[in-house]
Amino acid sequence: MQDELFETEKAPQKNTKNAKNAPKKSFEEHVHSLEQAIDRLNDPNLSLKDGMDLYKTAMQELVLAQKLLENAYLEYEKLQTLDKKA
């Protein structure tokens, strides 16, 4: 359960019918995907269409990474509250 707070569902494969069975992606994996996207976006030979598609994908990765970071912070705050009560 605890690990689920820090993972998001990876994009399902084309043949995957059930998103619940999709593997989870960690915060670090999202950040790595963002780093790769930034590297590719810096390619002067990247077409406008490919650049826009990559940008949209990168923004989705960013949102998911931010959600994981927020979940981690909320869990941290919860633990701090429990420590103060003890």
Swiss-Prot record:
Enzyme Commission number, as recorded: 3.1.11.6
Signal peptide: none
MF term (GO), any: exodeoxyribonuclease VII activity
Gene Ontology biological process terms from the UniProt entry: DNA catabolic process
Subcellular localization, as worded in the UniProt entry: Cytoplasm
Function field: Bidirectionally degrades single-stranded DNA into large acid-insoluble oligonucleotides, which are then degraded further into small acid-soluble oligonucleotides.
Pfam short name (any one): Exonuc_VII_S
Gene Ontology annotations for the cellular component aspect, listed alphabetically: cytoplasm; exodeoxyribonuclease VII complex
Region (Disordered): 1-26
Designated name of the protein: Exodeoxyribonuclease 7 small subunit
InterPro entries: Exonuc_VII_S, Exonuc_VII_ssu_sf
Gene3D superfamilies, per database record: Exonuclease VII, small subunit
